Every structure is written in structure tokens, then in C-alpha cells.
């Protein structure tokens, strides 16, 4: 995008990448306020927000909290349109963290290759994920994020009733966020959206078919 003349800002959300692993509840509101704080500190008046996977939930929440900042919403393989069985107890215990690490850490990096339709074209992607496992608090962040999910229909109806343009982009072979499971629901809550399917791609269509995506 930057090569095509766009001004682009990307960030690692709390608990991801090189951002701080907070000892806090990892809610959509926490992430949204992180984005809002960055926008306001940079004195940016309006932004086009792109949210990938769980990032789709985050940009929806930004639009809920600060709609005046949002010029467009672009959802890429967003996980935010599914019905969620909300957790009653949202706290994360040390046992849950230890169990998660023991059960998932040996294979979690290799599992990232399942995001692709053609993982053989992305050798080494799993190695990059290994770096995240080195940071204290990463497992807790993943668990807390999942526990704080809820069904976002109210927010999406609010967005539908606003003047914010909405775009949804999907890989045609995404096995992580399966479009067929919520196809009818998204049509009911966001009928004005413009929708695109990227051919020959899984959960990361911008990486597998960048020519069509761009």
C-alpha cells in the first residue's frame, strides 16, 4: 500500500508481537482504545481501518467507540461475525496458562501454516511465530482474548446504520474462518457492505494472492 502512495500505519496489539503483554483483561475495548490512542496521539483526523482475523473485531469496536475517526472499515478474513458462546468466567488462572503452554506450544507454530491454502509456498512462516512464544504473558494473552469474545451483532447493526462504508474480503479457501458458517447472518446485519473473494487463498489472502488483493 505504501508503495502505491498510501500513508500506512501498522501496529502490534497488546499481547502480540513486540507490544507489551499486559496483566489485564484482553478485551475488544482494550485493543480498540490502543488503536484510538495511537490515532489521536498522531493527530490523525480520519482513518481507513483494516482488520485481519481478530483485528476485525477490533476495528468494529473502534467504530463503536469513535465513529467520527473512521472513514472506512475493511475486514480481511474477520472472525468478528460469528456467534460466540460467551465465557462466564473471564479470568485466566495460572493453571490454564500452564496447561495451554504444555498442550499447545509444541505444535502451535507449525499450526500457523494451516492459515494458507498452499503452505509449501510459505516455508519459514512458522519459525517467525516461534519468537512470540519467548515472551512472558503471550499464552495468557491468547487465552484472555478468547475468553473475552462475545457476539458483535449489536455493534455491526450500528455500523450498518451509520454512513461508514464497509468492505469484507475473504480467501476463497479459508478453513480458519469459514464463511459458509455465517454467510446468512452477515447478509442480515451488514447488507450494504461490498464483498470480495480472493482466489486461491486461505486465511491470509493478502499474502497468498497479493495481486488480486491489491
Regions found by a protein language model. Name each.
Residues 84-90, 100-162:
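Conserved alpha/beta-hydrolase catalytic His-Asp/Glu region
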Residues 148-149, 172-177:
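Acidic catalytic loop of the alpha/beta-hydrolase fold
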Residues 155-156, 164, 178-187:
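Short alpha-helix in the alpha/beta-hydrolase fold that links the catalytic acid
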Residues 57-65, 72-104:
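Flexible "cap/lid" loop of the alpha/beta hydrolase fold
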Residues 3, 9-50:
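Active-site loop/oxyanion-hole signature of alpha/beta-hydrolase fold enzymes
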Residues 201-211:
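Catalytic histidine-centered segment of alpha/beta-hydrolase-like enzymes
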Residues 51, 55-56:
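Catalytic nucleophile loop
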Amino acid at each position: 500500500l505504501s508503495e502505491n502512495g498510501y500513508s500506512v500505519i501498522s501496529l502490534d496489539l497488546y499481547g502480540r508481537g513486540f507490544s507489551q503483554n499486559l496483566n489485564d483483561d484482553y478485551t475488544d475495548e482494550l485493543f480498540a482504545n490502543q488503536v484510538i490512542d495511537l490515532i489521536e496521539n498522531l493527530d490523525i483526523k480520519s482513518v481507513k481501518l483494516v482488520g485481519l482475523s481478530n483485528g476485525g473485531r477490533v476495528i468494529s469496536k473502534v467504530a463503536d467507540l469513535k465513529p467520527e475517526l473512521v472513514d472506512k472499515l475493511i475486514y480481511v478474513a474477520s472472525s468478528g461475525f460469528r456467534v460466540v458462546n460467551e465465557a462466564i468466567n473471564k479470568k485466566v488462572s495460572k493453571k490454564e496458562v500452564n496447561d495451554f503452554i504444555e498442550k499447545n506450544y509444541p505444535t502451535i507454530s507449525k499450526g500457523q501454516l494451516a492459515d494458507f491454502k498452499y503452505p509449501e509456498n510459505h516455508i519459514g512462516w512458522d519459525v517467525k511465530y516461534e519468537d512470540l512464544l519467548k515472551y512472558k504473558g503471550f499464552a495468557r494473552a491468547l487465552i484472555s482474548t478468547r475468553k473475552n469474545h462475545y457476539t458483535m451483532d449489536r455493534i455491526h447493526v450500528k455500523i450498518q446504520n451509520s454512513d461508514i462504508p464497509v468492505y469484507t474480503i475473504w480467501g476463497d479457501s479459508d478453513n480458519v474462518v469459514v464463511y459458509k458458517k455465517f454467510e446468512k447472518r452477515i447478509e442480515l446485519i451488514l447488507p450494504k457492505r461490498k464483498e470480495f473473494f480472493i482466489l486461491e487463498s486461505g486465511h491470509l489472502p493478502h499474502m497468498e494472492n497479493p495481486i488480486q488483493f491489491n
